[in-house]
């Protein structure tokens, strides 16, 4: 059975070409990857428009063997969409994800990006609705040396976690994207 990954990037749309390049390494027999751009830099695009793009990607797959993978700010989107579309999604993985704690984010960042604020509010609302069975199909990959997102915001109760210990947020994401994709593809 083919496994499908829908990759949801974090802030920093200018890095999307690099992300797409890294995702080429994720493709292997039995694994298909779809990159869904978030367009975080578009101040007019709402969180809901981002969710609609993810929903459209989900509708392309007949089976339920789809895992949402969210990176950084995309972690919040992946978890909120997992809760919202549980009937079409088999699991969620976050890579250095901002997975909870809307109040922990600097208000200046929200002022620049209302869609990110709405994603954080959505994930905080979604988390209590996830059962222990739902959480058993989730994985958080984080770095205790991230420097941007703390363990408190990324590690979720009842969800398996892997600490990659790579220094710096972007370096840790790049490590998973280019060198350790197996952390995701072997755990979905």
Indicate where each model-derived feature is located:
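Glycine-rich His-Gly loop
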Residues: 8-11, 143
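Short, charged, surface-exposed secondary-structure boundary motifs
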Residues: 44, 102-108, 169-177
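The serine-hydrolase catalytic nucleophile loop
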Residues: 14-21
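Conserved alpha/beta-hydrolase
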Residues: 22-42
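Proline/glycine-enriched tight loop/beta-turn segments at coil->beta junctions
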Residues: 1-3
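Short, aromatic/basic amphipathic alpha-helical patches
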Residues: 21-27, 152-157
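Serine-dependent carboxylesterase/thioesterase catalytic core
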Residues: 5-8, 16, 32-35, 49-137, ...
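C-terminal catalytic-base region of ester-bond hydrolases, centering on the histidine
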Residues: 133-188
């Amino acid at each position: 059975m083919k496994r499908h990954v829908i990759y949801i990037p974090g802030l920093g749309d200018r890095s999307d070409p690099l992300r797409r390049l890294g995702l080429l390494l994720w493709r292997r027999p039995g694994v298909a990857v779809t990159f869904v751009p978030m367009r975080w830099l578009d101040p007019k695009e709402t969180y809901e428009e981002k969710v609609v793009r993810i929903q459209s990607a989900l509708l392309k797959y007949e089976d339920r063997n789809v895992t949402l993978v969210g990176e950084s700010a995309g972690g919040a989107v992946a978890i909120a969409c997992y809760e919202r579309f549980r009937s079409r999604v088999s699991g969620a993985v976050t890579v250095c994800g901002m997975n909870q704690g809307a109040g922990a984010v600097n208000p200046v960042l929200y002022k620049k990006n209302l869609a990110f604020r709405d994603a954080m509010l959505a994930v905080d609302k979604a988390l209590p609705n996830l059962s222990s069975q739902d959480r058993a199909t989730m994985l958080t990959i984080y770095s205790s040396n991230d420097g941007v997102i703390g363990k408190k915001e990324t590690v979720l109760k009842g969800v398996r976690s892997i600490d990659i210990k790579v220094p710096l947020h972007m370096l840790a994401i790049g490590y998973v994207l280019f060198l350790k994709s197996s952390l995701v593809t072997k755990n979905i």
